[in-house]
């Protein structure tokens, strides 16, 4: 059965699954929905409209579903949607969307958001991502599956972080990061493919070799992005990873980090 600490405040219009646990001094507002198996620790603030899936664990002093500080926001109904099996550590801030964009901020499944991470309005975090302490996403950012953002990484509005990519500590990301790349610095620059991450995720030696060749083609030969994509295309015929890489290059709207 649901356990709600006597000092917690839960709005009658909030919807909690039968086995949700709510710690002391937590506030859960109107329009909040929390799925089965979730644990909300002490001193958490949840505001709606916010949908939280199953088996999420939200730690103390996090602010989840607060309105965006975007000055264009005038109180319109917008959402925060969180999937399943996420760990949201201490002091994390997750803001709802704006009607000027998609109207919702979205966190996928199986993510780890470490202490003091910020996810701004209208951002989308995929699945199996790790955002290390104090990483901050400005509004409208997309983080694709299995990306890892190092501590104190800052990401500019409308940037996209590609799948399986990695940012070094303190990176300042102002452009799009292609899939599989490792970047570092302020401003962030591409250093190599995310070699260790790809090994851990079970990519074959052949795929890693082709991605390493692709990195050199994109970043070491002085090609335009269009020319690099053209030369990469033959490699994609028997390599799904190269297909993913090309798709991330074509999806870039801000230009890629160099």
From Swiss-Prot:
It catalyses: a (3R)-hydroxyacyl-[ACP] + UDP-N-acetyl-alpha-D-glucosamine = a UDP-3-O-[(3R)-3-hydroxyacyl]-N-acetyl-alpha-D-glucosamine + holo-[ACP]. GO terms for biological process: lipid A biosynthetic process. It comes from Saccharophagus degradans (strain 2-40 / ATCC 43961 / DSM 17024). Homotrimer. Belongs to the transferase hexapeptide repeat family. LpxA subfamily. GO terms for cellular component: cytoplasm; membrane. Its EC number is 2.3.1.129. Involved in the biosynthesis of lipid A, a phosphorylated glycolipid that anchors the lipopolysaccharide to the outer membrane of the cell. Keywords: Acyltransferase, Cytoplasm, Lipid A biosynthesis, Lipid biosynthesis, Lipid metabolism, Repeat, Transferase. It is an enzyme of class 2 (transferase). It is found in: Cytoplasm. HAMAP family: LpxA. Pathway: Glycolipid biosynthesis; lipid IV(A) biosynthesis; lipid IV(A) from (3R)-3-hydroxytetradecanoyl-[acyl-carrier-protein] and UDP-N-acetyl-alpha-D-glucosamine: step 1/6. Its main location: cytoplasm. Pfam families: Acetyltransf_11 (PF13720), Hexapep (PF00132). This is Acyl-[acyl-carrier-protein]--UDP-N-acetylglucosamine O-acyltransferase. GO terms for molecular function: acyl-[acyl-carrier-protein]-UDP-N-acetylglucosamine O-acyltransferase activity.
């Amino acid at each position: 059965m649901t356990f709600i600490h006597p000092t917690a405040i839960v709005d009658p219009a909030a919807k909690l699954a039968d086995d949700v646990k709510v710690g002391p001094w937590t506030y859960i507002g109107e329009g909040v929905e929390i799925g089965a198996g979730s644990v909300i620790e002490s001193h958490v603030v949840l505001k709606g409209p916010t949908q939280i899936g199953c088996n999420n664990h939200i730690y103390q002093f996090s602010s989840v579903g607060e309105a965006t500080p975007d000055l264009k926001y005038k109180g319109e109904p917008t959402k925060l949607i969180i999937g399943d099996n996420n760990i949201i550590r201490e002091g994390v801030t997750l803001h709802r969307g704006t009607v000027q964009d998609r109207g919702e901020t979205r966190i996928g499944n199986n993510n780890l958001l470490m202490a003091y991470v910020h996810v701004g309005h209208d951002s989308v975090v995929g699945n199996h991502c790790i955002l290390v302490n104090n990483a901050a996403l400005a509004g409208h950012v997309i983080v694709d599956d299995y990306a890892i953002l190092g501590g104190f990484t800052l990401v500019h509005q409308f940037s996209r972080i590609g799948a399986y990519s990695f940012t070094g500590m303190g990176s300042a990301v102002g452009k799009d990061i292609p899939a599989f790349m490792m970047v570092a610095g302020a401003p962030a620059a591409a250093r190599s493919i995310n070699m260790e991450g790809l090994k851990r995720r079970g990519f074959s030696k052949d795929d890693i070799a082709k991605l390493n060749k692709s990195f050199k083609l994109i970043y070491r030969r002085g090609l335009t992005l269009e020319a690099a994509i053209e030369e990469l295309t033959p490699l994609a015929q028997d390599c799904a990873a190269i297909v993913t890489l090309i798709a991330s290059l074509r999806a870039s709207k801000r230009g890629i980090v160099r």
